[in-house]
Amino acid sequence: MFSSVEISILIHATESENKILKSLLEFIDRSIDNVQIKRIKTEGHWKNPIIRLIITINYEVDKIYNKLYKQMIEICGEDDANEYIKANTDRKEYLFTRLDKQKLCNGIIMLSDRDSVRMVFKKLGKFES
């Protein structure tokens, strides 16, 4: 179904990069050695340091999606989960989701548009294999 997932997280100076990364890796059931991580240092509005992590996974992506989908159903019901997926899937059939970063660090999966972990599930294009 999905060929890759790209996960993007902004980590502020007051947050623990290790805790956030560990929580995310636990959720996606991967070790740090089995994912591609790009780390970008940047600054916030008031020059405060921010780290952006971009994590790319190109194998067994459906396992991650299925785990997320199952938890979405438990939280909001199957109809609402399907409606969310439909509303957040573009014409290329990429699915865009955002999870609450603080809740994720506590082992809870919750959809959120604020201070979120952004996940983009991508399908293979017509000419890719």
Enumerate the language-model features and the residues they cover:
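Short, charge-patterned binding micro-sites
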Residues: 35-60
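Beta-strand elements of well-folded, non-transmembrane domains
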Residues: 9-13, 28, 57-61, 101-103, ...
